[in-house]
UniProtKB/Swiss-Prot annotation:
Name used for this protein in its record: Aspartate--tRNA ligase
A GO molecular-function annotation: aspartate-tRNA ligase activity
Any GO CC annotation of this UniProt entry: cytoplasm
Keyword Nucleotide-binding (UniProt): yes
Top class in the EC scheme: ligase
Catalysed reactions, as listed in the record: tRNA(Asp) + L-aspartate + ATP = L-aspartyl-tRNA(Asp) + AMP + diphosphate
Gene: aspS
Binding site for ATP: R226, D227, E228, Q235, E487, G539, L540, D541, R542
One BP annotation, GO: aspartyl-tRNA aminoacylation
Length: 593
């Protein structure tokens, strides 16, 4: 049985003692990293979240403590009192390596079985084991550093927003289901049988209602929930830094958030963010990078060859252009010697993005090699090389198809090649604002328009008339902040006119009755003097991934789910008692074989 503290207080953390603490009598508490018995002396490395302290026990220091220390093992939780002294052999690899603690008294607070994972940096264990024993995984120094970074980030954000007049306010977790986009997590109501709450995908509607309420600068750091298929950087529950402001336009929100980003990245990670951050319209991002989340750390931009080959008789080019598509290409420098097998793999790669094929031109020292050369005139080949600014050693990769297929396939190929060729500077942080997004996207299956962001996004002033005549061309007052090809956050100016909001719902295929059934409380609120307003939300988890230098979102969440939205630690979700289901008015239906 472990010993009680009996009034004993920790006076210093394990990672804090330095030479200026020599001579002080202190008490440290933590976990045994390792123990070394050298006969007359026992050395214990004691660890807490701040670091490691070496403790030395000896018969001449205190016989009782020496004998007791021989019983401790790895991961025992202990408390030690003694004097800080200068180490005879300093360890320059440790922050506390100039000093050690002479152990005069020891309490074994609790014992530990042999841990199923090693408590050390750079652990090589399966993800499932790490998640099952997450409380041990979280003891590891590299994990503890991540969560100290997370804490500091939240503090810097809170301090900055407080200094800029924001109020931290909470919005409901149990709310109304308004299915549009990702699936909701539903919570059955005991009091209203057959009815359900939904967990919020974002605080969007409530923060807009707070603007109507007169709280002109709101923020919160809050949980959001989406029941969607998981990817490497997604979790079913995640954390947002959410904000909303009244009486603002796009520039106001963007300028404020540039200052916030600069402060966070500098104070938390020592990274300088060059201001102002570049802004790029969505159309340009798609045409140059094939993505609305462009990675600007390398070139290899997409070039439009449509004009250069507009009169070509080559069926692939001609067919794409006549169908309203385009012919575009990227240039891979020093890749002209790439073998046929490698190029075949690239062709297979673009086909996964619905491209019909991949044409190529290798600009070699003694020849221009290409399977499509025989279909092109000399003038067309020359025009392509000029447009691509091709030099000896370059490989030109061409896709001809519908624009969306061309952009998506070449954008993905650009990233794929950059990783394969190792031309991305991993130490660089390239921010960019993507602006002027399409307001709507047409869903062929449902035969209606859908909001690209959400149905509350304001329309660019010059495009309002297009809502009646050509909704697909309407641009939104929306903006995403992108870092190294990942969306860090996004927001927009909101519609604050009830008639325009109703019209927006109509364009989205909602009847007036359906719109009022789902969003009547918001439309009603908009009758009472709503201010112009807009905001932005960051994915905190993704931000921490950048600040901590990890590529796995599970590393930055204390108790994450696995790729199947299952928690190996608690084994959630789980089967519940029939009595609980009965109280909720729910009956299980057994599937027939």
């Amino acid at each position: 049985m472990g010993e009680a503290l009996r009034g004993l207080k920790r006076t210093i953390m394990c990672g804090e003692p330095r030479e200026n603490n020599i001579g002080e009598k202190v008490t440290v508490m933590g976990w045994v990293q390792r123990k070394r018995n050298l006969g007359g002396l026992i050395f214990v490395d004691l660890r807490d979240r701040t670091g490691i302290m070496q403790i030395v026990f000896g018969e001449e220091i205190n016989k009782e403590a020496f004998e007791k220390s021989d019983n401790v093992k790895s991961e025992y939780c202990i408390a030690v009192t003694g004097e800080i002294v200068k180490r005879q052999s300093p360890n320059n690899d440790m922050e506390t390596g100039a000093v050690e603690l002479k152990g005069e008294d020891i309490k074994i607070l609790s014992e530990s079985e042999t841990p199923p994972i090693y408590i050390k940096e750079g652990l090589d264990a399966s993800e499932n084991v790490r998640l099952k024993y997450r409380y041990l995984d979280l003891r590891r120094p590299d994990m503890q550093k991540i969560f100290m970074i997370r804490h500091k980030t939240c503090k810097v954000v809170r301090d900055f927003l407080d200094e800029n007049g924001f109020l931290e306010m909470e919005t409901p977790i149990l709310t109304k289901s308004t299915p549009e986009g990702a699936r909701d997590y539903l919570v059955p109501s005991r009091n209203y049988k057959g009815m359900f709450y939904a967990l919020p995908q974002s605080p969007q509607i409530f923060k807009q209602l707070l603007m109507v309420s007169g709280y002109d600068k709101y923020f919160q750091i809050t949980k959001c929930f989406r029941d969607e298929d998981l990817r490497a950087n997604r979790q079913p529950e995640f954390t947002q830094i959410d904000m909303e402001l009244s009486f603002v336009e796009e520039d106001d929100v963007i300028d404020l958030n540039e200052k916030l980003l600069a402060k966070v990245f500098k104070e938390v990670a020592g990274i300088d963010v060059k201001l102002p951050i570049e802004r790029m319209p969505y159309k340009i991002a798609m045409e140059k990078y094939g993505s609305d989340k462009p990675d600007l750390r390398f070139g290899m931009e997409i070039n439009d060859l449509t004009e250069a080959v507009k009169n070509s008789e080559f069926k692939v080019f001609k067919g794409a252009i006549e169908a309203g598509g385009s012919v575009r290409a990227i240039k891979a420098e020093n890749c002209a010697t790439m073998g046929r097998k490698q190029i075949d793999k690239l062709q297979d790669f673009v086909k996964t993005y619905k491209a019909k094929g991949l044409a190529w031109i290798a600009y070699k020292e003694d020849e221009i090699k290409s399977p499509i050369a025989k279909f092109l005139t000399e003038e067309e080949m020359k025009a392509i090389l000029e447009k691509m600014d091709a030099k000896v050693g370059d490989l030109i990769l061409i896709v001809a198809d519908k624009n969306n297929v061309v952009f998506e396939s070449l954008g993905a190929l650009r990233l794929h090649l950059a990783k394969e060729l190792d031309i991305i500077n991993k130490d660089e942080f390239r921010f960019v604002w993507i602006t002027e997004f399409p307001l709507l996207a047409y869903n062929e299956e449902e035969g209606r328009y859908q909001a690209e962001h959400h149905p509350f996004t304001a329309i660019m002033d010059e495009d309002i008339d297009l809502l009646d005549t050509d909704p697909g061309k309407v641009r939104a007052k929306a903006y995403d902040i992108v870092l190294n090809g990942e969306e860090l956050g996004g927001g927009s100016i909101r519609i604050h006119d009830s008639k325009l909001q109703e019209k927006m719902f109509s364009v989205l295929g909602f009847t007036k009755e359906k719109a009022w059934e789902r969003f009547g409380f918001l439309l009603e609120a908009f009758k009472f003097g709503p201010p112009p307003h807009g905001g932005l939300a960051y994915g905190l988890d993704r931000m921490i991934m950048f600040l901590a230098g990890t590529e796995n979102i599970k590393d930055v969440i204390t108790f994450p789910k696995n790729q199947n939205a299952f928690c190996p630690l608690t084994e959630a979700p789980n089967v519940v008692d029939e009595n609980q289901l009965e109280e909720l008015g729910i009956k299980k239906i057994e599937k027939e074989d």
